[in-house]
Amino acid sequence: MVYKLVLLFCIASLGYSVEYKNTICPPRQDYRYWYFAAELTIGVNYDINSTIIGECYMSESYIDRNANIVLTGYGLEINMTIMDTDQRFVAAAEGVGKDNKLSVMLFTTQRLDKVHHNISVIITCMEMNCGTTKYNSDLPESIHHKSSCDITINGSCVTCVNLETDPTKINPHYLHPKDKYLYHNSKYGMRGSYGVTFIDELNQCLLDIKELSYDICYRE
């Protein structure tokens, strides 16, 4: 009886002495659940008239808790990094809106709104109006969100940039792969919005993504 009591005491003590540690989910080759983490709108000063199938290409990586995605298409290279995060990018889609605006939908493995991260965006003009760095600073907040976002724009082709994190709306007509499940933030107050403009008012950089047609970015 005494032996059993001592054994139970040791087991209980061992259980309380183990420190809880976060674990990192093992990487998958093909993620089935896509979270709509961000929508990026970019205005350019050359003509882009409609969504082109097969125009966008992507590569992604996850190194030292930093999730990175690089997109090329429509004369732009977009490089985005979410720092110190458990999630990684799984997919992206691009669509062309009115007045030479490009909309980019970004999908990750989990939501952003519970843990706030630092975000870095680099946009480079690849085909027209290439040149020196036009803008290198924080992206101002238009809706309060406990994240910082810095942006670098290389070249002079960009007229405006707007980034919305944890959007509450998703394009119902987006033809995502049938074996994927899309989900998104449903709490209006958990969104974040950042924007900068060089020509028009910032509200001219906003698009109704429900009216656009998108094509998924192909992996390189």
From Swiss-Prot:
PTMs per UniProt: Glycosylated by host.
Induction summary: Expressed in the early phase of the viral replicative cycle.
Family: Belongs to the orthopoxvirus OPG038 family.
Extent of the signal sequence: 1-17
Protein name per the record: Early protein OPG038
Function comment: Plays a role in immune evasion. When secreted, inhibits T-cell activation by preventing the binding of host CD80 and CD86 to soluble CTLA4 and CD28. In the infected cell, may inhibits host NF kappa B activation.
Subunit record text: Homooligomer. Interacts with host CD80 and CD86 when secreted.
Organism domain of life: Viruses
Subcellular location: Host endoplasmic reticulum; Secreted
Primary localization: host cell
Protein's GO biological process: symbiont-mediated suppression of host NF-kappaB cascade
Keyword hit for Secreted: yes
InterPro entries per record: Poxvirus_M2 (IPR006971)
Alphabetical UniProt keywords: Early protein, Glycoprotein, Host endoplasmic reticulum, Host-virus interaction, Inhibition of host NF-kappa-B by virus, Secreted, Signal, Viral immunoevasion
Gene giving rise to this polypeptide: OPG038
GO CC annotations, alphabetized: extracellular region; host cell endoplasmic reticulum
